[in-house]
């Protein structure tokens, strides 16, 4: 399998000299092949990570996705080959899930698509479930991942969709195996019970999802739930509303609610077995860019290998937002110098506790700066450059990590898409 994926990446590299399509996306109902090359560099000092505080990874990702459209308007196939190649890493530094330890890695995927009617769809096999990557049309509660690394979220099992009316969507998924952005050391792995002693999911338990979404031209309200024996029961809601202020200005509000309860073998007598999170964001959009404010509150922190609670709107490369009793608040501005070049400036404040004992208080402040440039014409049309730098500081009186923690983080990404139809 690794040889097959590696050969695909060689083909991707050869294609990088060809003309790129701007914002290339595969349409579900047409045949196509998308090639994505993504070069990423991460260098950081994250003292809250303990022995893994020094972070360095430089990688080249090659991602190939193909889609057949539908034969007789009923059945089709989709698939891909993803690979992350190591360009730079050091044995004495963490690669923070960009690599398999300090090694290259990859995998392939493929699924059969069945369209019983124009308003329904069934997928069987291994398929993408990452809305940021374009695998799903929007952020479906609990089902949709948003990978923070080179490769997107992938699920193995069955996915179903039914447009009940033009405004109401129903989604269901049964997932036996999964790849999340923290699974670089395992690749596609079984869903199941996490063993903190071995760092593996050694008891296989499939996970079932159900979600519904109502939408119109300015709103989307979605609700989803999942059940997984011996792991957790979860529920999530996502509410989005845009208000036109005049032809050139809009106000958008977003609100996320989340609740999780551990079940069976995942329950712990010394730690909280349930948690809740609420987070929201308000964005004012103007011709020159946008101004936004966001906030979030997490009741109890949980092991991210069991329940992912890092899903709120405030964002920082350095500071944790998913600690015990954590509040996080952020203000920011995106300023568009040209239609292609955008600058971002976003300070953040956090308040919470280091553990469920609540004996060490965390008071964090940080600032994020970033720039994004997209090539809009010429042979490199569609190439996207992203650079972000983050500086943070936490006060943790009495912590074994130190009373004052200083953070810095730099992330760079260059992405290039090429489409064949």
Swiss-Prot record:
Gene3D superfamilies: Porin (2.40.160.10). It is found in: Cell outer membrane. GO terms for biological process: monoatomic ion transport. GO terms for cellular component: cell outer membrane; pore complex. The keyword Membrane applies. Induction: In the presence of glucuronides. It comes from Escherichia coli (strain K12). Keywords: Cell outer membrane, Ion transport, Membrane, Porin, Signal, Sugar transport, Transmembrane, Transmembrane beta strand, Transport. Its main location: membrane. InterPro entries: OM_porin_bac (IPR005318), Porin_dom_sf (IPR023614). The keyword Transport applies. Residues 1-23 form the signal peptide. One of its GO terms (molecular function) is porin activity. Pfam families: OprD. Enhances the activity of the UidB (GusB) glucuronide transporter, on its own however it has no transport activity. Glucuronide transport does not occur in strain K12 due to a variant at position 100 of the UidB (GusB, AC P0CE44, AC P0CE45) protein. Belongs to the outer membrane porin (Opr) (TC 1.B.25) family. It comes from the Bacteria. This is Membrane-associated protein UidC.
């Amino acid at each position: 399998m690794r040889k097959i994926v590696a050969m695909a990446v060689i083909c991707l590299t050869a294609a990088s000299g060809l003309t790129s399509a701007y914002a290339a996306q595969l349409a579900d109902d047409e045949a196509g092949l998308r090639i994505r090359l993504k070069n990423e560099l991460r260098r950081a000092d994250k003292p809250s990570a303990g022995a893994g505080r020094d972070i360095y990874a430089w990688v080249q990702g090659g991602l190939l996705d193909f889609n057949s459209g539908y034969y007789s308007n009923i059945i089709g196939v989709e698939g891909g080959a993803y690979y992350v190649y190591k360009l730079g890493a050091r044995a004495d530094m963490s690669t923070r899930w960009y690599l398999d330890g300090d090694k290259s890695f990859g995998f392939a995927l493929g699924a059969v698509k069945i369209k019983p009617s124009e308003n329904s769809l069934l997928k069987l096999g291994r398929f993408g479930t990452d809305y940021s990557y374009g695998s799903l049309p929007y952020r479906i509660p609990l089902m949709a991942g948003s990978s923070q690394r080179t490769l997107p979220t992938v699920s193995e099992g069955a996915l179903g969709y039914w447009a009940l009316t033009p405004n109401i969507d129903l989604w269901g998924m049964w997932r036996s195996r999964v790849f999340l952005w923290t699974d670089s050391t395992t690749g596609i792995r079984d869903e199941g019970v996490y063993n903190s002693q071995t760092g593996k999911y050694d008891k296989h338990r499939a996970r079932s999802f159900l979600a519904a979404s109502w939408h119109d031209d300015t709103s989307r309200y979605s609700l989803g739930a999942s059940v997984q024996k011996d792991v957790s029961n979860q529920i999530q809601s996502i509410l989005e509303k845009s208000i036109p202020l005049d032809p050139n200005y809009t106000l958008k509000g977003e609100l996320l609610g989340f609740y999780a309860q551990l079940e069976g073998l995942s329950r712990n007598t010394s730690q909280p077995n349930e948690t809740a999170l609420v987070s929201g964001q308000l964005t004012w959009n103007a011709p020159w860019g946008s101004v936004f404010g966001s906030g979030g509150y997490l009741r109890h922190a949980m092991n991210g290998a069991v329940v992912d609670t890092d899903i709120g709107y405030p964002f920082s490369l350095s500071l944790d937002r998913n600690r015990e009793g954590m509040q996080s608040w952020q203000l920011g501005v995106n300023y568009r110098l040209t239609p292609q070049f955008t600058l971002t400036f976003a300070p953040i404040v956090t308040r919470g506790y280091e553990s469920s004992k609540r004996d060490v208080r965390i008071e964090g402040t940080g600032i994020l700066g970033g720039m994004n440039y997209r090539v809009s014409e010429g042979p490199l049309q569609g190439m996207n450059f992203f650079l972000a730098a983050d500086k943070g500081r936490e006060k943790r009186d009495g912590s074994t990590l130190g009373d004052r923690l200083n953070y810095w983080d730099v992330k760079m990404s260059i992405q290039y898409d090429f489409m064949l139809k």
